[in-house]
């Protein structure tokens, strides 16, 4: 994919990494950078914070690999159809992925919870990409795959609760090249 407009978002961040054997654990804290016009005058945005813990365990039985993660997001000035308020959103996720002979698979489930002003946040996403690859001789290969994504949405813009999944920092055309809208009601 080529890079889309308004895609880059720089962050000031700190990250700790632990790697041993088949385990990889990363913890981080980040804030988006507010870009100013002069040289060396950019600062961290005090209104937004992003933090998390991401763990990967590779080479489990049955050629499985497993990701488990927690992501946190705080936005003091979040704007949705329900209005403007402080948003604190937590995401718990798991991803199972791997390859067995010619079959490859990638299954991911995420659940979000938190607060938006006086309302509650409850949202989810489920994504899968499963494929089968045929060798056509030499370096040529043909892969057939099925990709399915399900994202929760909000059904009542008049209540204070949010049920729309927030992808935090999606690429411009997250769903497809033809998508006319994004994933959340902003």
Residues covered by each model-derived region:
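Signature for the C-terminal beta-barrel architecture of outer-membrane proteins
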Residues: 2-161
